[in-house]
Amino acid sequence: KNLLLYNNIFIHDSSSYYETPSWPNRIFPKFFNVVIKINTQLSLVDLFKTVKKIEKIVGRKKALKNYPRICDIDIIDFKGLSLETQLNGQQIETPHPRMQSRNFVIFPLYELNKTWIHPKTKVKIDSIINQFKNSDFSDIRIV
């Protein structure tokens, strides 16, 4: 929290913490996920740079894709806009391009904003949730 405040990122609201099996390999430790709603005057690029800096400060190391990591901060939505840009060859896209298929993103987001609408597809969050399978509901729990 102090790292966010130090970087002029203010927490407006926060979901419960959600536990899910590691993905795609369930032999790894479980993941813990939370969605926070923030207020900031930072641009998308500056916010992206800041969250990458925070990940590094708390101990994130380069690892193979989908391997367990100490911290993974994604920008799910940025001011309700659909944006794409590049920074040093890395794609930055909001809303997050795979968010609608991830129960660990959608469920906590729904907890914070039951009327959220996907900025790109214009699909309501209720409709996104209704597309999940039963196993997507049983694989996640509030802790």
Tell where the protein language model's regions lie, with residue ranges:
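Flexible, gly/pro- and Lys/Arg-enriched active-site loops
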Residues: 23-31, 45-48, 53-143
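Short, surface-exposed acidic-centric catalytic microdomains
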Residues: 1-43
